[in-house]
């Protein structure tokens, strides 16, 4: 079920909230929790019921392993078993085809590559539960009930595409009985943020995607301006799409009196690649830092080890996003940029902020081309067209995408908006239920509903 669908907005969400707070108002807190677990599982199964059993099996397995680890007897063995099973599960569904293709290409074999449908949200709920097992090994978990653990993994705002949540932040909120009672301030903030996110997805991201897809589909026929329009367009599309989902997830959490972690903090305002990764997909960055980079040694064993750990971490982030060499290259590119950024800081030379911003934004945009491209040939051809300065003058007949001139200027205008407008999450810190917010919410909601004639997936559903 999509957040940007009529059945979610007008059926699922009102029913879930009404029954949840009904049981809360009657002080039937166990009933309220059970209802939220069941409705979240239904939310997951509505998309494809075939993988509900897989989700439940994963939850049961990780909960049992977590309890075994908490007993402190042979906890290292149980941790290894738990992490190995999680990695194998994710590897089977996400990377089997990719690895078999590499074997066929390298060994000259002709193995039949099976068509394996990627279960929705598997990367997210696998990372969430793996972090839980590691925290149990560190002695940071406290024997939560199975129902509470189920809610932690399945609560519907975050289940499909994050943000990645952590037990120490979320489970105390689930156990707080006051959160089962309706809070009208949270409900108002949640509705406002949900409307803004819905607007960003339907009105901005989905409209940008039309001409971005057309440009990438005609990658071998692009001129200078079209190539730049495609690169800029996808840079904006991905941000508006993914940040919209994250903001809608946070908004839904607010309606349930839950504070989900912020995933974006105006990343395209970053003045360095280091700064960018502190602002982009923040919960993934936290996960990689806490459960991969630091355990590998972090920056504790000299500069070379620090650079190596950074690069390996970014390669894994790339592979986590998708089973393809373009994703690995994208991760490696960011790893290299981070290494350069850290070494530049050691020189003590400070560049003017406009130059820092321009270098950062251009590097990120260039890397996104590999992230979006289906293969290296497509990515390299688009980049070649971007730097084919002999083709700057374009005849109108050569434009492959409808209204390209308008789209280029729209992209530039969007860039200005991204630079100067505050993050919606930051804006909500000053939220007051007044006519201004009522107007923003109503206008954003009405425009979004008017344009919501087709349902489009969020880009991060594929990861």
Map each language-model feature to its residues.
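Membrane-embedded transmembrane alpha-helical bundles that form the catalytic cores
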Residues: 1-414, 423, 427-462
């Amino acid at each position: 079920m999509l957040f940007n669908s009529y059945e979610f907005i007008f059926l699922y969400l009102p029913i879930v909230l009404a029954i949840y707070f009904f049981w809360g108002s009657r002080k039937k807190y166990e009933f309220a929790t059970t209802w939220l677990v069941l409705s979240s599982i239904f939310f997951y199964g509505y998309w494809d019921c075939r993988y509900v059993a897989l989700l439940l099996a994963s939850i049961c397995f990780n909960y049992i392993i977590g309890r075994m680890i908490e007993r402190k007897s042979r906890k290292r063995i149980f941790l290894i078993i738990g992490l190995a099973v999680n990695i194998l599960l994710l590897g089977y569904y996400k990377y089997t085809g990719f690895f078999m293709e590499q074997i066929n290409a390298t060994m000259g074999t002709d193995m039949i590559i099976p068509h394996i449908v990627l279960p929705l949200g598997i990367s997210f709920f696998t990372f969430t539960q793996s972090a839980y097992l590691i925290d149990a090994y560190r002695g940071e978990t406290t024997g939560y009930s199975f129902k509470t653990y189920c809610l932690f993994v399945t609560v519907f705002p975050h289940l499909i595409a994050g943000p990645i949540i952590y037990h120490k932040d979320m489970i105390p909120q689930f156990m707080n009985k006051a959160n089962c009672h309706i809070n009208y301030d949270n409900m108002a903030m949640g509705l406002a943020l949900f409307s803004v996110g819905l607007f960003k997805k339907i009105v901005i991201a989905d409209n940008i995607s039309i001409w971005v897809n057309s440009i990438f589909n005609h990658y071998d026929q692009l001129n200078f301006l079209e190539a730049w329009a495609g690169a800029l367009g996808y840079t904006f599309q991905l941000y508006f799409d993914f940040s919209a989902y994250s903001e809608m997830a946070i908004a839904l959490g607010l309606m349930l009196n839950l504070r989900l972690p912020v995933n974006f903090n105006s990343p395209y305002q970053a003045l360095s690649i280091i700064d960018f990764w502190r602002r982009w997909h923040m919960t993934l960055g936290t996960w990689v830092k806490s459960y991969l980079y630091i355990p590998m040694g972090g920056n504790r064993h000299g500069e070379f080890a620090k650079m190596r750990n950074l690069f390996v971490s970014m390669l894994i982030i790339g592979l986590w996003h998708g089973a393809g060499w373009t994703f690995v290259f994208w991760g490696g590119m960011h790893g290299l940029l981070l290494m350069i950024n850290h070494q530049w800081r050691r020189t003590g030379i400070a560049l003017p902020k406009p130059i820092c911003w321009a270098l950062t934004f251009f590097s990120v945009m260039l890397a996104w081309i590999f992230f979006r491209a289906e293969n290296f040939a497509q990515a390299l051809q688009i980049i070649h067209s971007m730097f084919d300065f002999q083709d700057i003058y374009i005849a109108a007949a050569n434009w492959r995408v409808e209204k390209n001139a308008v789209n280029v200027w729209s992209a530039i205008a969007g860039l200005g908006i991204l630079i100067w407008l505050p993050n919606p999450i930051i804006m909500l810190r000053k939220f007051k239920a007044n006519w201004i917010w009522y107007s923003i919410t109503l206008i954003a909601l009405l425009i979004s509903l008017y344009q919501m004639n087709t349902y489009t997936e969020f880009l991060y559903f594929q990861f």
